[in-house]
């Protein structure tokens, strides 16, 4: 009886493993992620792998080596994207996975890096186990995500020529940076992927918020990536002597701006939904303690999954500004800046496959939206996309304190692998 029981348990265990499919090598994944974190540190040992920096070049060389070890034919396209390709067994459109490895100044070691290293680990797992997908597999490490999702925008044909002149903290312009990465700004048109040219794209990413961590959930199934718009708001008053100008005779631009900041918060809260509005920067001129500010320039950012909601909130904020201007003897000017991204809904059928993958691995999951922009946002202009989130400890991101546990990272990679294989089986194009 004992032998029969042992045999039954062994068969059951093997059956469960077969149902779950292959799993990534968690130790290798986390070791490679840790190794990547060593590239691009500043003199204080802090993460600082900004796009186009020496550390970025070194990290990219490390990543290219891993991709080649995983059996991927790896090239750098004209926009500086690193693309590793493995042929499929059939003449089908490719399925893409990947993320980015560049970071904000003094950022963290997990934003983008988790998704990039997990995508490479997925390819390595398939290579190790001799699994050939029906669709060609593309692992894409996008260039300069933090500086305006440059690489993914180039693939989508949405990179504006004027963006090439934007200079980042390294001192290189975007155009110079592309050349530095091995790209070619004269051939950017060649990298554009027509709509429908890929079967699907799936990106694994840390949440960069605290919902999954707070609710003790393993996986976030992303419903959509919010769009965001930026404005510079200029408040014009009259600079005057702070000691000789009575309070009732002032045209204080900073006071009007302070009322505006409060109004932005109030208007964002009035609308039912998950929209957010932020004033994150403010500059008062002339900036002297004994002069009433005559001019203030501040930022305005609005994010939501709906363009219509962004429009409505912006209009409401403008109306509040008109009221404040009339009360304070000031004027408000709104200057729209280049948007970081349009709202992008993920494909519901890819969401379903991500949920199925999580459940097959006995991982808890919840639906959620992404409040941050991602490369998948621009890839949605090319093909159906999906996004998988894993918890960020304490909701901290864009900081050296950013952290996701090795277990959560491995869980996310396993969900990515399972989702990829399910899509490969089910997609017919």
Language-model segments: residues:
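Zn-dependent metallopeptidase/amidohydrolase metal-coordination segment
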Residues: 21, 26-32, 42, 95-99, ...
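Alpha-helical metal-binding/catalytic segments enriched in His/Glu/Asp
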Residues: 97, 106-146, 229-235, 241-267, ...
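Midchain, well-structured core segments that form catalytic/ion-binding scaffolds
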Residues: 148, 157-307
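N-terminal hydrophobic or amphipathic helices/low-complexity stretches enriched
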Residues: 18-48, 87, 291-292
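Catalytic-core environment of secreted peptidases
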Residues: 70, 82-114, 119
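A non-catalytic alpha/beta surface segment that caps or lines the substrate-entry region
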Residues: 41-87
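His/Asp/Glu-rich mid-to-C-terminal helical/loop segments that flank catalytic regions of hydrolases
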Residues: 223-225, 241, 245-271, 314, ...
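A short beta-alpha structural unit
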Residues: 51, 278-287, 299, 331-351, ...
């Amino acid at each position: 009886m004992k032998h029969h029981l042992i045999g039954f348990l062994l068969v059951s265990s093997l059956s469960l493993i077969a149902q779950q499919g292959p799993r990534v090598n968690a130790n290798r994944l986390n070791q490679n992620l840790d190794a990547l974190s060593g590239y691009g540190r500043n003199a204080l040992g802090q993460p600082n792998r900004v796009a186009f920096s020496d550390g970025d070049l070194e990290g990219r060389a490390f990543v290219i080596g891993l991709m080649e070890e995983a059996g991927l034919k790896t090239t750098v396209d004209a926009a500086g994207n690193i693309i590793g390709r493995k042929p499929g067994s059939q003449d089908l459109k490719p399925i893409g996975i990947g993320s980015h490895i560049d970071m904000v100044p003094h950022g963290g070691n997990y934003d983008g890096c988790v998704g990039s290293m997990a995508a490479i680990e997925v390819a390595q797992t398939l290579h190790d186990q001799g699994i050939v997908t029906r669709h060609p597999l593309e692992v894409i490490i996008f260039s300069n995500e933090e500086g305006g999702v440059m690489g993914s925008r180039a693939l989508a044909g949405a990179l504006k020529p004027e963006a090439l002149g934007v200079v980042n903290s390294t001192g290189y312009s975007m155009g110079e940076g592309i050349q530095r990465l091995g790209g070619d700004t004269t051939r950017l048109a060649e990298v554009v992927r027509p709509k429908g040219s890929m079967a699907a794209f799936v990106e694994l990413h840390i949440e960069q918020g605290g919902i999954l961590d707070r609710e003790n959930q393993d996986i976030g199934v992303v419903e959509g990536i919010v769009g965001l718009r930026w404005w510079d708001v200029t408040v014009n008053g009259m600079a005057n002597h702070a000691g000789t100008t009575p309070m009732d005779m002032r045209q204080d631009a900073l006071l009007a701006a302070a009322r505006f900041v409060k109004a932005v918060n109030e208007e964002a809260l009035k609308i039912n939904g998950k929209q957010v509005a932020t004033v994150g920067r403010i500059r008062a001129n002339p900036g002297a303690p004994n002069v009433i500010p005559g001019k203030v320039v501040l930022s305005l950012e609005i994010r939501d999954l709906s363009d219509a909601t962004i429009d409505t909130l912006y209009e409401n904020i403008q109306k509040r500004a008109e009221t404040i201007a009339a009360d304070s003897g000031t004027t408000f000017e709104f200057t729209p800046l280049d948007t970081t991204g349009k709202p992008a809904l993920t494909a519901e059928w890819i969401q379903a496959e991500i949920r199925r993958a999580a459940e097959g691995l006995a991982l808890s999951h919840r639906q959620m939206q992404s409040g941050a922009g991602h490369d998948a946002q621009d890839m949605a202009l090319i093909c159906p996309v999906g996004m998988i989130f894993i918890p960020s400890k304490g909701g901290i991101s864009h900081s050296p304190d950013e952290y996701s546990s090795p277990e959560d990272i491995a869980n996310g990679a396993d969900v990515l692998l399972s989702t990829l294989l399910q899509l490969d089986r089910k997609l017919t194009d």
